């Protein structure tokens, strides 16, 4: 079989048909990704300001989302408390650092339940205070009014539901 040049081995991609709605949706996806990264940067900056360098922003968000719940590692993902792929690693680190307590379930010894320690609650409170300050600033500036943030959240929940249905359909 003759060798192909790199240009021949990859079929040319034809442009997808796009309309204004598609373009707006794609822009929303880019904004959403940037917002997530900026949120992590804000958490990182807050912890640097407080002189706390032991946690990554992802770990701080895991602590924040865990809150007062006591769940298994699997439930962290299924309940939307953690979106990453390395939940076991981050939980292990948080246990080692003293932010999360873990214990085996009585009913199923393979399963581990996790909850925040007092030190973890303090981190959660730090992140909550940061987000409250941001919400107050956004409220005062009027950013949350047009369109109302509640309507924006409703729209994002609809997108979330659509995506979840797409994933269920695949499997």
Regions found by a protein language model. Give the residues of each.
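Basic amphipathic alpha-helical segments that dock to polyanions
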Residues: 63, 76, 91-97
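Alpha-helical linker/hinge and terminal dimerization helices associated
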Residues: 35, 39-42, 46, 80, ...
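N-terminal helix-turn-helix DNA-binding core of bacterial DNA-binding proteins
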Residues: 42-86
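Charged, amphipathic alpha-helical coiled-coil/dimerization segments
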Residues: 14, 92-151
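N-terminal leader segment of winged-helix/HTH proteins
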Residues: 1-53
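N-terminal positioning helix adjacent to the helix-turn-helix/winged-helix DNA-binding module
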Residues: 24, 57-58, 119
């Amino acid at each position: 079989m003759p060798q192909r040049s790199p240009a021949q081995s990859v079929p040319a991609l034809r442009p997808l048909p796009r309309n204004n709605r598609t373009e707006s949706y794609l822009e929303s996806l880019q904004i959403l990704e940037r917002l997530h990264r900026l949120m992590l940067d804000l958490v990182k900056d807050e912890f640097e300001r407080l002189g706390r360098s032991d946690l990554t922003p992802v770990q701080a968000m895991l602590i924040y989302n865990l809150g007062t719940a006591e769940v298994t590692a699997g439930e962290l993902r299924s309940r939307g408390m953690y979106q990453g792929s390395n939940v076991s690693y981050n939980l292990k680190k948080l246990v080692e650092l003293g932010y999360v307590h873990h214990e085996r379930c009585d009913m199923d010894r393979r399963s581990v339940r996790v909850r925040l320690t007092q030190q973890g609650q303090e981190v959660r409170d730090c992140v909550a205070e940061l987000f409250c300050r941001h919400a107050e600033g956004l409220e005062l500036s009027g950013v949350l009014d047009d369109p109302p943030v509640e309507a924006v959240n409703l729209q994002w929940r609809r997108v979330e539901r659509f995506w979840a249905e797409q994933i269920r359909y695949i499997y």
